[in-house]
Amino acid sequence: MKTRTQQIEELQKEWTQPRWEGITRPYSAEEVVKLRGSVNPECTLAQLGAAKMWRLLHGEAKKGYINSLGALTGGQALQQAKAGIEAIYLSGWQVAADANLASSMYPDQSLYPANSVPAVVDRINNTFRRADQIQWASGIEPNDPRYVDYFLPIVADAEAGFGGVLNAFELMKSMIEAGAAAVHFEDQLASVKKCGHMGGKVLVPTQEAIQKLVAARLAADVMGVPTLVIARTDADAADLITSDCDPYDSGFITGERTSEGFYRTHAGIEQAISRGLAYAPYADLVWCETSTPDLELARRFADAIHAKYPGKLLAYNCSPSFNWQKNLDDKTIASFQQQLSDMGYKYQFITLAGIHSMWFNMFDLAHAYAQGEGMKHYVEKVQQPEFAAAKDGYTFVSHQQEVGTGYFDKVTTIIQGGASSVTALTGSTEEAQF
């Protein structure tokens, strides 16, 4: 076990590495170690994911940038890994709607239990672990061309932290324990938090938003994991703020008050840039939430951030809340992500891809099945396309194998001394027909 002094010296040395260039910590290594306790458990999946995410952002991504899809189940994340996606995005919106621990359906207003997103991170990582175990038990190793690296980095949504700085600190720790690689925090008031594409958003003072980023970084340092911190600002659209206490915000406050006591602000890109510049020293990536897929707006934000912080990584929400074809022509849509990447937006994601795909495809199947010729539509819309997708690496046609039946047959056989009459795949319809 390392002594307190050894841990402090090790941490001080770590912070001089290129990984931390441009990152401000308003606390000391001694203060971090003081909060750790005598035993600091390792968070292997979080460590692995954070390191992968950092490498992807710095040249290893196939396209030169990471483009993620939102997932809300382990199975969705598994299929993304098989299909070649390089990182998973887990949005609070999707968790609120269909994957929270209250077992209810909510809008994106931080109404669900605060430990719900960490629970889904854990569930996705457990699915990755099972898929990896199945692959490994089948004799497929990393040097095999059939090998799939299932342990994709997970970028998780912490919303506005579900409270104050202590809530943000504890939530970040829970995310890391579950295996998140990166976590984002937004600058809204947690008690009335809204989806970035809703009205009624209320900002907290810039200094308070910074303190939540510091809380997140401190939590990661206490856990001993280089988790990426992503700072999101909603200041492009939000025209309310809780207080005029922070001089940094004074240039945007109009003087008008609301019935709740909030202050009106001048929403827009200048307010967003101001916030982005304030957050940049405390975050690994900066994200400006926008109302439309606007390349010029994205360029203005990127140019302003990079004028003061050259090379600062940026994130962009390619949201389903945008009507893409209403805003852009097909050619621009096709080149949109590459153009963003050229501006420095190296992490791009479709927040609600998982839930839109899941709900639409079920409606499409159910409508045809209910209105038409029954099994014909299941075969045409699901089974035959699944067979056709096998050439691209899709394997869920053999659904018993996919979820681990063969793996647990191996467990049974080992326990029973090498022979068993109760294994599940032998004699199954999958063995006979697929």
Swiss-Prot record:
The entry's keywords: Glyoxylate bypass, Lyase, Magnesium, Metal-binding, Tricarboxylic acid cycle
Keyword Metal-binding: yes
EC number annotated for this UniProt entry: 4.1.3.1
Protein name listed in UniProt: Isocitrate lyase
GO biological process, one term: glyoxylate cycle
Active site (record annotation): C195 (proton acceptor)
Family: Belongs to the isocitrate lyase/PEP mutase superfamily. Isocitrate lyase family.
Taxonomic lineage: Bacteria, Pseudomonadati, Pseudomonadota, Gammaproteobacteria, Enterobacterales
UniProt subunit comment: Homotetramer.
